[in-house]
Amino acid sequence: MLKSAFRALGDLFSPEFRSVLFKALGLTIALFIAVLIIAEMLIASFTHFSWPWADRLVEVGTGLALLVAFFFLMSPVTAAFAGLFLDQIAERVEERHYPWDPRGTALPAGRAILISIQFFIVVLVVNLAVLPMVFFGVGAFVLVAANAYLIGREYFEMVAMRHMPLEEARMLRKENSPTVFIAALLPAFMTIVPFLNLAVPLFSTAYFTHLFKSVQASSA
């Protein structure tokens, strides 16, 4: 497990990883800029107060609300966009570290997009549900545990599906659920660290590619 983590950390600084991270960040920032522009246009069209300061107050309030939303949603949105490129990351890891193993098959584009959207929705809903607990003593632990389960399930199965059908990937993950969950605690902790959380999708892909190879070898 530690070996997988250190290997993934080394992969994280490769040019291919940086390229995917910059693409995902660029798409995320472009999306929020577009939302901000559209919101300002809608406010300008539908809010007309008798006092100019009231219009300005609404504009500033909306801008601040969107800014807060940007920082809160940046990580899951970046993860969703990064999900579109994760196959090439997994392929690069396999080529670099496991050239003697059978190559994985990239997921169909439609399937990859659907998985990214589903993962974004689930992570967002779970994090919103757990967020109020953060203000209590156990909140942070619950948040990390919830994210560990989600990250372990999603990334392990995604990597495994490059080599086997979904049903087999899911069964392999369940058979090794303690290992997968404990391994996922590291990227789950990264999700609560600002800016470091942006690297979670790429790190997790490399990390669980190494873990999958380890589990597969021990099961052989």
Task: Give, region by region, the residue ranges found by the protein language model.
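Selective recognition of hydrophobic, aromatic-rich stretches within alpha-helical transmembrane segments
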Residues: 59-91, 133-160, 195-219
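Membrane-interface segments at transmembrane-helix boundaries
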Residues: 2-5, 76-113, 154-174, 211-220
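Hydrophobic alpha-helical transmembrane segments in multi-pass membrane proteins
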Residues: 27-39, 70-71, 118-144, 183-201
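Interfacial aromatic "cap" segments that immediately flank transmembrane helices
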Residues: 8-26, 102-128, 152, 156-190
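Short alpha-helical linear motifs
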Residues: 45-50, 131-135, 166-172, 208-210
